[in-house]
Amino acid sequence: MAILVVALKYALHILGFEPVEQSSLHNSVISSVTFVIGFLLSATIADYKESERIPSEFAAQVENMYDDAASIYQNYPTFDIEGFRSQMYKIATGFTKDARRRSYDVRNDIRGLLPYFAEMEKGGVPANFIVKLKQQQVALLRSRHRVNYIQRIKFIPSATILARSIVIVLIALLLVTDINPFYGGLVMIGLISFILIYMLILIRVISTPFHKAGRTQDDVSLFLIKDAVNYLKNQANKTK
């Protein structure tokens, strides 16, 4: 895209269509556009960095919940520990599907733990143990909701429209500006165009941290969730 801008600027220079004289106002316009883009990028990166923390927290909660349930089962073997493990396995695999694709809803899997909590209550498991597991269940649900929100909601959509508009206006202004020396100015126009266009593309990409696996190199990795899935899978034989 930046190469196209440079080529177009060169063509306009050859044709002599550069009616705008270079002035100090150009520096002010470029600074203002850069500020708006930087503000939007910093806000988007904040959500992206939060998204990077969520998989590790979710994986830790999943493994910890199973470990707690297995520990409880040793003293109170009154509930289906294999069923509980299977449900945690569904939650871990379901989170990956939910984050990558909107067609799957892991909330039903998370709520599927409630019957096991009821079995624990009937089996005489101390209330504080069950309360802790329920709190962890809420934490799983909170993580799922946060990921879903970040995936679907764009940060100040009007600001994104503004950023794209002013970048287009700025590039158009630079194209019709008589810049001296020309070739040095041509390089600067190409550099400015490249930076601003790349920043807009970066904002669009990182505003959706969880793409389908392998779609972009900037996706948030879910390898810790896969580790939790493998951990639960390895525990299957131990509960038999």
Please state what every model-predicted region is.
Residues 16-38, 105-106:
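Acidic, low-complexity proline/glycine-rich segments
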Residues 33-36, 43, 191-198:
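Hydrophobic alpha-helical membrane-associated segments
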